[in-house]
Amino acid sequence: VLSTFVQGFFLQASLILALGAQNIFVLNSGLRRQRHLLVALVSSFCDALLVFVGVLGVATIFVQVPALKISLGVVGIGFLLFYGLLKLKEAKNGFEISYESKQATSTKQTILTALGFSLLNPHVYLDTVVLIGGYSTKFSDLTERFYFGAGASSFSTIWFFGLALLASLGSRLLSDPKAMRIISLISGVILVALAIKLGIDVVGWF
């Protein structure tokens, strides 16, 4: 059982330790202390949900319906472009970290945005649902699959909360407007690049 849990834990680690859109959003939320723990909670929940969807064998639906993947990809492109351009605008105009700016984002908006970054990217499904779900087929027993999924979900939770908390602790050091502009610029460029990459992938799916 422990071995199965550890396999899931480290497989998820190999997939999530990348500078993707979801990680950037969690990082930025932590740096601005904008409901960063809520963002981490939503991100962790979505990852766990997708992992268990894959482990329980629902991945075949996503694989067998190309139109679903393409539609999700198109929505994801628009989502990433919107937030990427928003970050570039912040890099140009600046973003002051203050009490007022922390309150500017409502709880509902925070949850919806976190859901968007967690669910509107086909690559997330390919990693969590298809890859992890596919790997879990080596375990014939449903109990083993559960522990495998629990291991993968545990790493996601540790990672997102750790990232949000560390970013929050470092926010005072990076609260200088110039530093925030640089962070926004880097985030914006990466998000736009991810949108372009996703667009190329979507074209290849036709």
Model segments located where?
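Juxtamembrane transmembrane-helix termini in multi-pass membrane transport proteins
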Residues: 2-70, 129-147
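Hydrophobic/aromatic residues within the transmembrane alpha-helices of Major Facilitator Superfamily
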Residues: 9, 13, 17, 48, ...
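Membrane helix-loop-helix hairpins that form the core translocation module of multi-pass transporters
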Residues: 34-110, 166-169, 186-189, 196
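Juxtamembrane boundary at the C-terminal end of a transmembrane helix
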Residues: 196-206
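Selected transmembrane alpha-helices and immediately adjacent juxtamembrane segments
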Residues: 107-128
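Alpha-helical transmembrane segments of MFS and MFS-like solute carriers/permeases
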Residues: 7-11, 42, 112-117, 151, ...
